[in-house]
């Protein structure tokens, strides 16, 4: 059976429907940065997702080609994730999605080196005839965070965030969202195929002890 990050690391991908504390270690990602309303058809955000999956599957399917990745094992491509912020507000203003800035990411297995990533960029560019110059190798260590499973529409996230904020305050922490630690979402459902009320999204915020 292919290694499934969601099942093997449930503490990061399958939180309960109530807030909980988690310490997230250093991870490597395929990443694309941008600024746009994520709901725009043919917009920058949706194009970024195409780029991410292009590289993710080039790496996954390397097992069938000449480029051998040391330590490779078969795996399920991890879910799409996103770091979100807006320059003009403290937190997230869901009524002005056109102001969203974001880093879209897909987690990389630890065996993928920067050299393997660079090979995948060249290989995908050659095979798919697309421009992958915006795609980067990103390393992040989120550290101490609060997270919660949000069930339902993305537009209903403020209620889950409010519950997280109350949990943070009640337990002697405070939000630590900054230019380097951001609002984080992990998408466990495909919004193109799942009804809004059935979407499952992990929401994660950085925190620090008071």
Residue ranges and their predicted role:
Residues 1-210:
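A solvent-exposed interaction/effector surface
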């Amino acid at each position: 059976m292919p290694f499934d990050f969601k099942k093997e690391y449930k503490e990061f991908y399958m939180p309960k429907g109530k807030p909980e504390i988690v310490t997230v270690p250093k991870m490597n990602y395929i990443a694309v940065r941008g600024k746009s309303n994520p709901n725009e058809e043919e917009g920058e955000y949706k194009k970024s997702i195409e780029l991410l999956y292009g590289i993710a599957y080039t790496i996954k399917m390397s097992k069938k080609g000449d480029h051998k990745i040391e330590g490779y094992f078969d795996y399920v491509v991890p879910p799409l994730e996103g770091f979100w912020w807006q320059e003009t507000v403290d937190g997230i203003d869901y009524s002005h999605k056109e102001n969203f800035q974001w880093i879209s990411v897909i987690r990389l297995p630890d065996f993928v080196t920067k050299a393997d990533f660079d090979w995948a960029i060249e290989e995908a560019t050659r095979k798919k005839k697309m421009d992958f110059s915006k795609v980067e190798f990103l390393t992040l260590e989120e550290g101490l965070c609060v997270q919660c499973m949000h069930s339902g529409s993305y537009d209903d996230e403020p209620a889950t965030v409010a519950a997280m904020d109350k949990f943070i305050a009640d337990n002697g922490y405070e939000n630590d969202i900054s230019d380097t630690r951001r609002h984080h979402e992990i998408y466990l459902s495909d919004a193109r195929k799942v009804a809004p009320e059935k979407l499952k999204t992990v929401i994660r915020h950085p925190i620090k002890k008071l």
